[in-house]
Amino acid sequence: MNSDYSLERADGFQGPIVISDPDNEDEKQLAAFYYAEEIIFLQDWYHQDGDTRHAGLDSVPFIWIGYAQSFLINGGGIFAPCLTVGEDSIYDSTNPVWKPMACAADCSVIENYIKTITVEPGKTYRLRIIGAQELIGVNFAIQNHNMTVVEADGTIVEPFAVENLDIMPGQRYSVLVTFDKEVGTYLATTGVRYRSQSPTGYILFKYQGAGEGVPSILEDEVNNPFQGTAGFSTAVPPHPVWNDTEPTIALESKLFTMNTDYFPDYSYITQNDDSLVRRIVIAGNQLTQNSTGKLRWAANNVTSMMGAAPMITIAYDAVTTDGALPWPGTKIPGTLIVPDKPPSKFIVSDCLGRIL
């Protein structure tokens, strides 16, 4: 779960839940275009427990949690130092050095840890890609196979083809993939986005009738546990450079809903002609709160302090009282408008977790 209200916790039981509306006509029409569906569940896995990471993030001075030690796809992955440095090593991202640990005796048997999805040749599958990462945004791609994006965060969109796809924490996409290449086993990987390092995630797509074993490129790839600071991965297929924003902008510029009936209230945005030519710039930054010494996220130099009740509860009560106008006609108590130009002074508001 990606949290927008407080610190999230990534310990314990995790997994996907897909809730479908059997009466949704868009979903019914989409279902005619694919043979079956599979889940791609993405996770960055920290080897420290959540309490330890939480304590560091909430301390003064701030202690950064660093990069995850492993990346999992559908719960499987490899902590590559087991393969390259021996049975008594672990990567310490804060130093960085190798430190003693015990690795599983069968760690070198790649098939034991990397998951495999078996597909029928010539069939089209819907892949529900779920970004369950705690921190790291990634780019997902399948060796020698393009993807067609058909759904984003539960909304059916106009289809468009991509070679790879950015998945940030909390995001969900559905893509259609036709497995019409030469029968074999193909590697899919993740590449880090907007961070200079991250372990790589792996999953295999195996055509029915393919031989045993894994692609030789995978044997080489697991010997490179972290993508270097230059941001290039040795994985096949290639991913964008970690700090290249163009692929993300291009992706989001193509996202258009198939059914505008889902947004009946959008017209209020265009009631004022000025709204069509207004440019709003929101800059996110981290600042130190003088009273506590803690780091805080801010938007245009304005940050927020959480109240006792969730903001959604306060907002609901405000707009459902007698005589209240629909938002934004009714002001939400404890909130303020982010200024269009950042104030020179850092402002701490008493709003409830979100600035409107």
Identify the function of each model-found stretch.
Residues E25-E27, N146-I156:
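Short aromatic-acidic-glycine turn motif
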Residues I129-Q133, D350, L356:
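Asparagine-centered strand-capping/turn motif at beta-strand->loop junctions
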Residues T124, L135-N139, I355:
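Exposed beta-strand and adjacent loop surfaces of beta-rich binding modules
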Residues A10-D58, F160-I355:
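Extended terminal and domain-junction accessory segments
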Residues D4-S6, A132, G191-R193:
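Beta-strand-rich extracellular modules
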